[in-house]
Amino acid sequence: MLSVGSLLPDIHSARLIMISKTPLPITVRRMDFDIPELPRYWYKGNAWTTHFMNALSTTFPDGERFFIHAVRNYEKEITDPELRAQIRAFIGQEANHGKEHEAFNQALIDQHKLPLEKKLIFMKKALGFAKKKYSRREQLALTVGFEHFTAILANLMLKQTDVIEEVQGMTADMFMWHAVEETEHKAVAFDVFTATEDDYWLRVRGMAQATFFFLLITMRMQYSLLRHDNQLGNWRDALGFAKFLLVKPGMFTRIIPEYLDFYRPGFHPWQHDNRHLISERVKELESYALRAVNAA
């Protein structure tokens, strides 16, 4: 377990004070989820919402590797031992997220013959292009934006547990584990950026670009999967998906205040302190990991 403190004792440097605001341990958990036989439309039987979640999962493996790459580019420049420990924990967690979502994506391919291979190749090429086109500071700003996006979505899942709990078995456990760990490390990339670049306009530009790419890629993949399943004309599920986004749980509408707060000068992710939401979830994850070890 890697533990990180709350504030550095150096009160003379505003930048150093900003570095270590993560107020809880960042724990690397190797879960090894056993993906069960899934219904084709595993999210409440809704094709549109299921393929939205499938599209999210498809972006994760190479997305997580891109985030690791962007943060690792700056690792040698960080001298603060607490932030260096956070970086190592961040890398460990993100690597495990990529591995588990790769297994989940492969299960979708094997069980339902979903055409994810081309989409995974597209993600790899798109992020390879980003590494070539964007400078390392732009890559880090983009990562900070994506990390905030995933953190506020994770916060919604933790606050409104029915988002995931109505999904049965290991699928629910995997997404909740991901939400817990995205919360634990939500400030790491931000603090690396603050310690090395600290450029407000670069930060907000990175968030705007991350938003554009997130919506474009996710919606493109969802559309493709719906077309493959001949579900584009399923208006009942389309309306159910609209309710999912806009009403209950309000996957998009309820994150708007936290999303907009990112654009405020002086913002820090832990100004949205949601430690209380993960304490019980952490106990559940530790119990699950212990059961998995005993069963092995």
Residue ranges and their predicted role:
Residues 17-296:
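Non-heme di-metal
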Residues 1-17:
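N-terminal amphipathic/basic-hydrophobic helices that include classical n-h-c signal peptides
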